Amino acid sequence: MTKGTSSFGKRHNKTHTLCRRCGRSSYHIQKSTCAQCGYPAAKLRSYNWSVKAKRRKTTGTGRMQHLKVVRRRFRNGFREGTQAKPKKAVASK
């Protein structure tokens, strides 16, 4: 019996299933850890040796629902509770 290519065809059990956090099929059932995001660890799995992977998952690749609003408010100096001045009527000749 070889332990290489011919043996791999006999495998039929799933080692990985869907991860609750990242949604990928990378959650190792026996280890109870995700190979992609590191779940159940509190912090996301991320390494400097994989710069491309960081680029795919970093801030700005998703909706940024909250950060978009904060950025706009920052440009206006975080002003709150003010009313827009009424537009002046254009003098017609």
Curated annotation (Swiss-Prot):
Zn(2+) binds at residues 19, 22, 34, 37. Disulfide bonds: none annotated. The keyword RNA-binding applies. A zinc finger (C4-type) spans 19-37. One of its GO terms (molecular function) is structural constituent of ribosome. Binds 1 zinc ion per subunit. GO terms for biological process: cytoplasmic translation. Its cofactor is Zn(2+). GO terms for cellular component: cytosolic large ribosomal subunit; cytosolic ribosome. It comes from the Eukaryota. Signal peptide: none annotated. Keywords: Metal-binding, Ribonucleoprotein, Ribosomal protein, RNA-binding, rRNA-binding, Zinc, Zinc-finger. The keyword RNA-binding applies. It holds the Pfam family Ribosomal_L37e. PANTHER family: 60S RIBOSOMAL PROTEIN L37, RIBOSOMAL PROTEIN L37. Belongs to the eukaryotic ribosomal protein eL37 family. Binds to the 23S rRNA. This is Large ribosomal subunit protein eL37A. It comes from Drosophila melanogaster.
